[in-house]
From Swiss-Prot:
One Pfam family in the UniProt entry: DHO_dh
Cofactor requirements of the protein: FMN
Protein name (database record): Dihydroorotate dehydrogenase B (NAD(+)), catalytic subunit
Subunit architecture: Heterotetramer of 2 PyrK and 2 PyrD type B subunits.
GO molecular function terms attached to this record: dihydroorotate dehydrogenase (NAD+) activity
E.C. code: 1.3.1.14
Length: 305
């Protein structure tokens, strides 16, 4: 039997396999190049970018939890100018699509970032992090209010011809309503879930462990929530969905595809095993071989309910 076809396509971006790296867990790609063959994964999604460099939150900002981790890094990044000057040259050398995750404090900032990224040939597409407060409108998080999400996505859509993926926050009452708002604003694809908001407490000091008090929960603990949300959203929209949340193995990744995801992102697993994304892609291929499946696309949305 010839090797199964693991290739998928997201909004015109051709991936050799469905495994992408999740933003914030893989640096800008170069940091992991010594541990992972970057040409054995589907795409690299870079650490979230902002217009200006960002120092992030004070420490402590990471805490291990049962079945996962809490992070309050605070979107620390080099800023768009340093990204173009120092990070893009490496991406030019890699034969794997690079998708740039970015965020802003206002609709205008999102649009400006999209406009600048649009001009960089090495950027195959963009992933918008809408889990940020809108500083012009009382700090409401863009990703928790459909109209706010629509306005950001629409502004980005008008600023670029490159594929636009929107990363959805799970900290909402109705994830489908948010998905519809982004699809209506002409997003090309949706990725979900971002982290769930959580906290950890030190009983001895009676204080929060994280300096920021709350942080984002990720890892295996969130996988059942992520699977459910991916399943709901994939049924509700016509654009591709990318599954994120606690993916540690090829089995986990394939479950997300059955739920309706076209591709997946590996995040927290990268901290435990720097080669996780490559290993997960290999495990997916082995499953297809073992089960006589010739094309991974046969599994997308094949959940029998």
């Amino acid at each position: 039997m010839k090797r199964p076809d693991l290739s998928v396509e997201i909004a015109g971006i051709k991936l050799r396999n469905p495994v992408m790296t999740a933003s914030g867990t893989f640096g800008y790609g170069e940091e992991f190049a010594a541990y992972v063959n970057l040409e054995k994964i589907g795409a690299i999604i870079t650490k979230g970018l902002s217009l200006k460099p960002k120092a992030g939150n004070p420490t402590p900002r990471i805490q291990e939890t049962t079945g996962g981790m809490l992070n309050a890094i605070g979107l620390q990044n080099v800023g768009i100018d340093a990204f173009i000057e120092k990070k893009v040259p490496f991406l030019r050398t890699v034969n794997t699509p690079a998708i740039v995750n970015f965020f802003g404090n206002t609709v205008e900032e999102y649009a400006e970032l999209a406009e600048r990224l649009d001009k960089i040939p090495e950027v195959a597409g963009m992933e918008i992090n809408i889990s940020c407060p809108n500083v012009k409108h009382g700090g409401i998080v863009f990703g928790t209010e459909p109209k706010a999400a629509y306005s950001v996505v629409k502004a980005v859509r008008e600023a670029t011809i490159k594929p636009v993926i929107v990363k959805l926050s799970p900290n909402v009452t109705d994830i489908v309503e948010m998905a519809w708002a982004c699809a209506d604003a002409e997003a090309d694809a949706l990725s979900l879930i971002n982290t769930l908001t959580g906290m950890a407490i030190d009983l001895k000091s009676r204080r929060p462990i994280l300096a920021n008090v709350t942080g984002g929960l990720s890892g295996p603990a969130v996988k059942p929530v992520a699977l459910r949300m991916v399943w709901q959203v994939a049924k509700a929209v016509k654009i591709p969905v990318i599954g994120i949340g606690g993916i540690m193995s090829g089995t986990d990744a394939l479950e997300f595809m059955l739920a309706g995801a076209t591709a997946v992102q590996v995040g927290t697993a990268n901290f435990l095993d720097p080669a996780a994304s490559e290993r997960i892609a290999a495990e997916m291929e082995q499953y297809l071989v073992n089960n006589g499946i010739t094309d991974v696309k046969e599994l997308i949305g094949a959940l029998q309910v």
